């Protein structure tokens, strides 16, 4: 931050508005609506991932309009532009999922490109789904301008009328689990159809504490979005208010000289980790928070997640493992209630600056209601689990680390024998054909950031495993990822990945594997001399996808243990 007297609220746009040499630039800006009274106003990029492909982003165009109103009212000039977004729900379980995590980098790069080429002074960044949220936050951290993030909001839960006459509250995850149940003969095709027609009743991101809601909560916790803005559903009128206030806020940040890296610090990122732990959030938060830290040039490692998780209890009884959705969190006060509970317990840093220009502690003064309700969000002294919802494992199978969502892991210890599959499709076939049995450890490899490429999510197969009724008897381990909606015994982000020669590449059918959550261990119980002999003859399968954007990505992407960032 700088002293108010030294602040230029047009730190970059003077490059296109000032002087004889910028006659042509001003001429073009006149054509989009600017005039003589606008040249001294800061130019604010209003970037959104709006599209008509997925309900997650449908209301962003409307919200961008209100954000622009807020910019105008505060004395700035908004200039709207768009970026891409990939729907994980639609892309799941097939070739399209190779592009999901890749889209995070494309979003970041595209926002940087427009903001830098057009010399915009600050930004309101709007997003509504799993990769667009971290992509926008990464862009804010990289650019280090005055920036505000605004979430689209989540959808409401649907109600499916089942063939037995009952009604069932459903989210998108129920559709994936219904596939496995139908193939296992425990659900009729009629009921699957009823679920399909009900899981997405309208616009907004998936309603549970899946990746989009996890990252929206993290954005609020780190101070990059307005207090209370993560929880309201997409259809709620509060979204309009938050959009307008976000536009006003970015202009005020410029006036005060507050930039993204004044807010995105190691301490604020640890606050975000703490909130994710308390909510039982998505494993993808590990990747995304480390990637945001990388762009902010802040040190955040896998070890930090365990250190925070040791102290922060799991409080949120939220789907996919719990009973409630984000709209329920909204009803009892939203993310500020979680943050206040953690602050009062000394588990987050109240001195961190936020986009309001105030600290976390100042923002949380006088919130109403002030405390968790005890049901949707438990009190600190009555948690669901005494430690956080995510755990980092290490061991001979994952010397570089692996991630497990312990909020829903039903056993402290699992010992079984390997069933090895190179990529997801043959493993899915094995599930749907009833070929797995209790005690199997399904190894899905060559799905890492480089090996996929793209580190695909495994929601289709975890949903099928649960739907088939073997979710508590079969363990799934992969160098790929899991959806925030995945449930059951699943461990992802295994590093080093198979294509880098990690031990996961050496596993063979029948090998004994031991996972001990209490010891944070994941081990391949095969003698090192045997593994060395296997390594001598190791041959990686050919990958037909190493062209176009996937080819570029595979050359640049780093390990999952570093957030799968590209450089």
UniProtKB/Swiss-Prot annotation:
It catalyses: (2R)-2,3-dihydroxy-3-methylbutanoate = 3-methyl-2-oxobutanoate + H2O; (2R,3R)-2,3-dihydroxy-3-methylpentanoate = (S)-3-methyl-2-oxopentanoate + H2O. Mg(2+) binds at residues 88, 130-131, 457. [2Fe-2S] cluster binds at residues 56, 129, 206. GO terms for molecular function: 2 iron, 2 sulfur cluster binding; dihydroxy-acid dehydratase activity; magnesium ion binding. It is an enzyme of class 4 (lyase). InterPro entries: DHAD_IlvD/Edd, Dihydro-acid_dehy_C, DihydroxyA_deHydtase, DiOHA_6PGluconate_deHydtase_CS, ILV_EDD_C, ILV_EDD_N, IlvD/EDD_N. It comes from the Bacteria. The keyword Membrane does not apply. Functions in the biosynthesis of branched-chain amino acids. Catalyzes the dehydration of (2R,3R)-2,3-dihydroxy-3-methylpentanoate (2,3-dihydroxy-3-methylvalerate) into 2-oxo-3-methylpentanoate (2-oxo-3-methylvalerate) and of (2R)-2,3-dihydroxy-3-methylbutanoate (2,3-dihydroxyisovalerate) into 2-oxo-3-methylbutanoate (2-oxoisovalerate), the penultimate precursor to L-isoleucine and L-valine, respectively. Homodimer. This is Dihydroxy-acid dehydratase 2.
